[in-house]
């Protein structure tokens, strides 16, 4: 009785008419006999019941024992998932445990008039038949072990044909884990109460949250299982649910090797009468062999239900949720053999391990005695090794040969061709499969000469090789070539492969560029070369092949290296790509100037040979050089992806002064160039709303009317500088860009420079009171001023934008530039056209007004909108002269000391006499449009008021609005 272990058990009397004989009960455990009683009690009353035992507890054997106790005249339909493996399992157990006649429904012409007792049918076959009214069954059972009820087509077909007529549902998954599944099951068994006929009412009563929410711990597990308990209580009278850990002493019921061996024996004995073809038998056994955890079930071929048995030995209360999440039934079985990247090589390596000689003699010996068809096949094969190929067609034999030959040369092929095969498409993989199979009949190499004799010779050699039923690759091969299985086995495709072989043999040394014949032909050569060593008996016929192969294999290896070095994207070319990591120095600003890297210029290959000049990189904080010299592995870029296109687009927009509004924050050293490029894409619209945002290192969103950064550059021909007003401490100066090189200044270092200044100001109570009294009101006025009419600051922004566009062209023409107001380099620094930066000693005359007027410059800058552009020296002199001639200045002889400027600002804020230039008064400006010349004059007036390069002078107030 195959793998079933006999125990001295008495027969099981279910009723006066039903008896499970001791011939059956001796192979069942006590808990399986309990399940037989449970199901029969409901079945005798024509009631619906659910056999919901966990996977591995022998549900199919239980049902088979139950069916053996029923009268043979009763006809039972078992609806299965669309899986040959499940179908074979049912046939195996019914044939082994019972004497019932089993019929498989396959088409429209099948009827129930035949003298069979059990009818097995896949739900897809029943759905294709359509009208099932002519099929009369006494009992209907649904096997949900393949999650068939999760398929809406299967559920709709069952509800349409068998609603209220199903007697037994077999399921390994806890059906209380899904409310919709339970609702459909109760509809099939006619167990729904009247108030729950509609699913909305049923769901309102027994609603369960989504399992995803449970897994993410957004829902209390105690409440979840409390609700699951309500469902279990609702169906407890007609459901049987038990777990594996309750019967640990008796599990596993069968060893996986023993089960596989006996299933092979049964398949071999039934092969001549089986409705399964040879390839389907092989695929069934191969799928069983590929999943060894699934064979722990004894009398039950629930291979698909057994994947999750390692996770179900936990607590009883937790097991239903775990089953639903981790229990995969039949679908993943077809996925597992093809899970690899390289299916051709995996197939051959699996054949190496699994097709072993010890398995073949027990499979062959009963075959010689039992099957006369196999004996006749053996006579024609000219080799004394019989095999179970009784029903194989020619195409199936060719399919066998595709995976069997590479057994002996798998390792050599794997070493040389794994990167190549990865690059081939499916069609090339199929061509290499045919090439793999061509040299294997080394005993009949003459057949390769003519294409006509090749398929017949191959068919002769197919029968010579012992076919093991436990080969795991057939399902994977069907998965690989599902759309063109017939093309692989057709002789026409083989003809083309042979023609290519004839054509490319002399051409291999000349044309080394084509890769398609190279890959397939090299596999052919290594196949035959490796075959020539173990097969010494047939060495006479194949002795001329290695002489041709040796010169042809040698140029193949360096050519493979050449093609690999041409494509730098592969992972095995890392030694060649090591010179490339310095390329971030070109793309990130301050390493090289624009002389080495223009916009959209190709990156030079010898970047390491280019030595950067001495003063190319200024004295900067430590984090910036670390960022520039990061290896390319820290960037999220491959070696072939060094050039970041968005960065080049950003450089094209600002040729001279690179836009740094998106780099105002301190650089994170782990930030990649791709991230920076993406950031530049996100924020290019910010300079539209601001004035002169391109050349400053301040974030545009934080600027207000009282929080403006000074201009960094002066484009005047004269190199003398105007001392600038200090920015607010809330907006630190964080960097500037010249010629594409950037100098970063971080928050900590700027805080050391600028934080003591607010403390000095806060010590004076007068300034503190002034800021608290007037600054909120002034900020409101500056914010609401654009709503009334375009005022001076807005016009000034337009002018600043135009001057910025002009500045791009003129900046490259000058030789020397001086940059002021930088805490790291002193107040002035000089930059020549080659990019060298040098500090400049300042004369005392220009330092003194800056030192004396720091506080007043801050106050003036906070009240009046700070200027963005500095006027030239000639314009400044004319403005000062016009100020002196103005008759309306209230104070003629006042020095621009600290007290004078403070009192002047105080008087202008309080609106005494001459307050028209304040930003408060600008709200009530006349409604006539102001021309740009007036705004330029106002800008220059405020620029001169903040202190000139010639020191403090006497000024008169200029009235703009009379």
Curated annotation (Swiss-Prot):
UniProt KW keywords: Chromatin regulator, Chromosome, Developmental protein, Nucleus
Subcellular location: Nucleus; Chromosome
Disordered, as annotated region: 353-413, 438-590, 658-712, 866-900, 916-962
GO biological process: chromosome organization; DNA endoreduplication; double-strand break repair via homologous recombination; heterochromatin formation; maintenance of protein location; negative regulation of DNA-templated DNA replication; positive regulation of DNA endoreduplication; protein localization to chromosome
Domain of life per record: Eukaryota
Biased composition annotated in UniProt, kind: Basic residues: 372-382, 553-562, 673-683, 885-894, 953-962
GO MF annotation terms: ATP binding; chromatin binding; DNA translocase activity
Any Gene Ontology CC annotation: nuclear replication fork
Record field: compositional bias (Basic and acidic residues): 386-395, 524-552
Residue ranges, compositional bias (Polar residues): 438-448, 480-489, 564-576, 703-712, 866-880, 916-944
Chief place where the protein resides: nucleus
Function: Required for underreplication of DNA, which is found in many late replicating euchromatic regions of salivary gland polytene chromosomes. Controls chromatin organization in polytene chromosomes.
PANTHER family according to UniProt: DNA EXCISION REPAIR PROTEIN ERCC-6-RELATED, SNF2/RAD54 FAMILY MEMBER
Protein name (database record): Protein suppressor of underreplication
Organism the protein comes from: Drosophila erecta (Fruit fly)
